[in-house]
Amino acid sequence: MNQNPVEEGQKFPLTIRRMGINGEGIGYFKKAVVFVPGAITGEEVVVEAVKVRDRFTEAKLNKIRKKSPNRVTAPCPVYEACGGCQLQHVAYSAQLELKRDIVIQSIEKHTKIDPTKLKIRPTIGMEDPWRYRNKSQFQTRMVGSGQVETGLFGANSHQLVPIEDCIVQQPVTIKVTNFVRDLLEKYGVPIYDEKAGSGIVRTIVVRTGVKTGETQLVFITNSKKLPKKREMLAEIEAALPEVTSIMQNVNQAKSSLIFGDETFLLAGKESIEEKLMELEFDLSARAFFQLNPFQTERLYQEVEKALVLTGSETLVDAYCGVGTIGQAFAGKVKEVRGMDIIPESIEDAKRNAEKNGIENVYYEVGKAEDVLPKWVNEGFRPDAVIVDPPRSGCDQGLIKSLLDVEAKQLVYVSCNPSTLARDLALLAKKYRIRYMQPVDMFPQTAHVETVVLLQLKDK
């Protein structure tokens, strides 16, 4: 039986009490919770119910009766349609406060830990919270008689929103994407049709090294074929000298994953170079690298502040990617070991260590939850562990391994407060949360990165 007093299509007044973990406003109508994208804490609004469930209602904003002083005009022309950003309508100082609150909400919802007893610091923001993303992944679509569009899927949909410019992207990523889009149209290259499963070019991926100026272009295709390849490569080489690597990745799966397993070189180098904290890193097409290079140094500085190192410690860099975090600490410890499931990332990590003259690192391909226990069985016990997992959080097998290994210091770098809270509840059996430091890696969005220092409890 539906206990919700709201009916679909119903319009009603609402006061927004707080904002949720996805950046939406939250209010209560006859004690039933209502989620309203685009509404801000303190606003009095009129909304229309669009989706009614037993325990909650999703509504759209119809009218603002009392506006928040933190409301600003979103500068992006496709902000409401695109779904890539959730907070452009919120003043930046208020975005930073919200992100700290999102961490608190996650602790409240997913653990029995009292967040008022935790030291949750104010969010570290950016001086200029625009044009920060070093990588774009724009889908392609054919419209009308041969016109090619590139853009992002709208929020919770597979409707492509055409994007001519994106104000959170590094300008070169947009410049290259638009140039390639026009080439695809000019040469009539077949564009992937999701419903029919036909066509060739699915996605245009561009990543740039902000410190080096090197840029990589990846054609994500539905087959190994790429018609008019020679002509397009010649035009790209002539017009875009900043593009130093052109790759093709084949993804034939009917899924939302961008990359497939097969990647090969079309022109230039296999990877691009980026610099971070006085180190140099090679980035291959599928390798993970932080999307906001400006804030990455701030993030790693917070990790550095969290760890107390004398130089005699052994350190594990779990989910190591191309080795950035571990190599930043290699000069401060006796040995660093890292693991990652993507073979290309481990190849990059090894090459990066060699390039940076770092000899006290060891890397292995594999899942963290498999590799760490293996190392322990071989007699290696880390004094400190850094985990920087994907949005899904730490695998439960890794949590068990961490609890078994009992490293004195554990730093958790999270990109998802919900899975962070879930993992902290499990780690709390043996670890004490010293503090949590939110870092804004993705201004204008509801995403928040958090550095958490955990210390082994005294027995």
Curated annotation (Swiss-Prot):
The record's section on InterPro entries has: MeTrfase_TrmA_AS, MeTrfase_TrmA_CS, NA-bd_OB-fold, SAM-dependent_MTases_sf, TRAM_dom, U5_MeTrfase_fam
Residue span(s) of domain TRAM: 5-63
Catalytic residues, per the record, are 415
Enzyme Commission no: 2.1.1.-
A single BP term in Gene Ontology:
rRNA base methylation
Annotated Gene Ontology MF terms? 4 iron, 4 sulfur cluster binding; metal ion binding; rRNA (uridine-C5-)-methyltransferase activity
Residues that bind S-adenosyl-L-methionine, according to the entry?
A: 290, 319, 340, 388
Q: Which residues bind [4Fe-4S] cluster?
A: 76, 82, 85, 166
Q: Which SUPFAM superfamilies match?
A: Nucleic acid-binding proteins (SSF50249), S-adenosyl-L-methionine-dependent methyltransferases (SSF53335)
Q: Which PROSITE patterns match?
A: SAM_MT_RNA_M5U (PS51687), TRAM (PS50926), TRMA_1 (PS01230), TRMA_2 (PS01231)
- Keywords from the UniProt entry: 4Fe-4S, Iron, Iron-sulfur, Metal-binding, Methyltransferase, S-adenosyl-L-methionine, Transferase
Keyword Metal-binding included in the entry's annotation: yes
Key word Metal-binding present: yes
Q: Which NCBIfam families match?
A: rumA
Q: Could you say which protein family the record assigns here?
A: Belongs to the class I-like SAM-binding methyltransferase superfamily. RNA M5U methyltransferase family.
PANTHER family per the UniProt record, alphabetical? PTHR11061:SF45, RNA M5U METHYLTRANSFERASE
Q: What is this protein called?
A: Uncharacterized RNA methyltransferase LMOf2365_1727
Source species:
Listeria monocytogenes serotype 4b (strain F2365)
Q: Top-down, what is the taxonomic lineage of the species of origin? A: Bacteria, Bacillati, Bacillota, Bacilli, Bacillales
